[in-house]
Amino acid sequence: MLVIPAIDLIGGEVVRLEKGDFAKKTVYARDPAEKAAELVRDGATLIHVVDLDGAKAGWPVNLDAVRAICAVPGAEVELGGGLRSLPDIEKVLELGVRYVVLGTAAVERLDLVRQACARFPGRVRSGIDARNGEVKIAGWLEGTGLGAAEVARRVKEAGVGLVEYTDVGRDGMFTGVDADGAARLQAEAGVQVVASGGVASLDDVRACRAAGLAGVIVGKALYEGRIALADAVRTAAE
């Protein structure tokens, strides 16, 4: 199972939000590339980058920071946030991004997901973010009335092989990851699932591994010193 550290970007800086609230922002690093290099040294092989400004705007905003992260040797990069057109997807892949994570597009533009999967096979993933069972889009700011399993089935049919599932209500709160919910989603939709949101300790890594998930994304727990990435990587491989 893969442990995937997260880098969230606002204004070119590494930040974390509490429950996805842009008003509750903590800046953890001014230099995203330096932070990425540190994560690679600690064992990261894939880094989950989210352009939070892009998620709100509807197009990629932090491209300079993304380019700098991609230039760090030793880890692949997946990017989400504001990727809602084929030219923008192509642009970030040309910057060196390995995988794109489509969230809002997975709900509003299933045709785009199909086109992207056909044009860039194996490089398109879907981010499904839910609060109280309802999928949220546009940087978690808008409800959809849809359930996670329904969206996961749709993107699977469009060609997506892996879904990253975030419980927005747990994100940044250290309440424990929803490994059981992610495992249910994996079984119901028949697609690989990476869990995210609420990771607080190595027990969460163990729970995701025991649930048979493809991976777990770790963010604030790393930045607040609750988990050492090297320990998490070791635990996932046990």
Swiss-Prot record:
GO cellular component: cytoplasm
GO biological process: L-histidine biosynthetic process; L-tryptophan biosynthetic process
A Pfam family: His_biosynth
Top EC group: isomerase
Active-site positions on this chain: D8 (proton acceptor), D129 (proton donor)
Location(s), subcellular: Cytoplasm
Keyword Amino-acid biosynthesis tagged: yes
GO molecular function annotations of the record: 1-(5-phosphoribosyl)-5-[(5-phosphoribosylamino)methylideneamino]imidazole-4-carboxamide isomerase activity
Domain of life: Bacteria
Catalytic activity, reaction form: 1-(5-phospho-beta-D-ribosyl)-5-[(5-phospho-beta-D-ribosylamino)methylideneamino]imidazole-4-carboxamide = 5-[(5-phospho-1-deoxy-D-ribulos-1-ylimino)methylamino]-1-(5-phospho-beta-D-ribosyl)imidazole-4-carboxamide
SUPFAM superfamilies on file: Ribulose-phoshate binding barrel
Keyword Amino-acid biosynthesis (UniProt): yes
EC number(s) recorded for this UniProt protein: 5.3.1.16
S-S pairs: none
Keywords, alphabetical: Amino-acid biosynthesis, Cytoplasm, Histidine biosynthesis, Isomerase
Metabolic or biological pathway: Amino-acid biosynthesis; L-histidine biosynthesis; L-histidine from 5-phospho-alpha-D-ribose 1-diphosphate: step 4/9
Family of this protein: Belongs to the HisA/HisF family.
Identification of the protein by name: 1-(5-phosphoribosyl)-5-[(5-phosphoribosylamino)methylideneamino] imidazole-4-carboxamide isomerase
Native species: Anaeromyxobacter dehalogenans (strain 2CP-C)
